Amino acid sequence: TRIKLATILPIIVGSKRELTAIRRNFEKNISALLKEKLSISDPAREVGQTNFHLAYHGRNDRALQVKIAQLYERACPSLLYTAPHCRPSARIEKAGKVKIGFISRYLFSHSVALTARGLMAELTKEQFAKYVFCVPPVQKDQVSALIRQAVDHAVVLPGSLAAARERIAEARLDILVYLDIGMEPLTYFLAFARLAPVQCVFPGHPVTTGIRTMDYFISSEALESAGADAHYSERLVRLKFLPVYYHRPEIPDKRKALREFGLDEGRTIYLCPQALFKVHPDFDEVMAGILRADPRGEVVLVEVREKH
């Protein structure tokens, strides 16, 4: 679709000048489409992508994200579905356990699940009825099994946007927690709906959603600057601690030597264990400066599975 073409972003950006030009063109494309009467019935299927790479530009993305969300709202009003129990006419249920749901595509051995698994487990079942909503395709491993054990209800969502909305609505949640809005299409477009009275997003993908049905962005004092509220369309919640709960990993007894990774043990190794698409153009000069200052230095970056 035209929206898909307008919202494509380069994966690797070569310079700050290029980055500025990319963002200017991106915003121009969205503004032009907002002036037209576009209509789509299922953006998760017809567009099938998010604005994932904006988060790595190191800029304030609020205005862009809000504008993109407005475009989708106008082109597909059904995105603003409201679950029956969230409508003004809904009867308020008697007090009981707080029904809280967590939703993600990455509820397996993935950084999203590894940071959130402990949080799910530590919420007491005396106070909370805990749900996880798994976005297909579902991957099963030890971490996914531990998550299922920690909650009361584990639900595999249908792949259809409309059917997934209905399935979540059936749970009549009090709180719905999105762990990583923006990392894949289904959860991004589900977030436009009102599926719980309180909806919040965790920093699994650390950028504002721009979506007006998202109430809170859960972050930390350690991660946000004094003026960071201006970067979020949601109400920014600064916890006094990081919103993660890591379990200590098991360290293998036998550790590999540098030579087993093809590295020279006589050199000073500077490891940057991040995917290349997360490396900002400003960091190029940082790496170059390290190598200029240390003639025996060697910067090691990580090759990701995807080829670009």
Task: Specify the residue positions occupied by each region the protein language model found.
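Substrate-binding clefts and catalytic carboxylate motifs of secreted carbohydrate-active enzymes
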Residues: L271-D282
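Short acidic-capped amphipathic helix/loop micro-motif used as an active-site/signal-coupling element
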Residues: R117, D284-A288
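A conserved nucleotide-sugar
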Residues: Q127-A129, A288-H308
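Short, well-ordered beta-strand segments
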Residues: K99-G101, L271, V300
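Alpha-helical solenoid repeat scaffolds of the TPR/TPR-like class and their adjacent stem/linker regions
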Residues: T1-E265, A275, E306
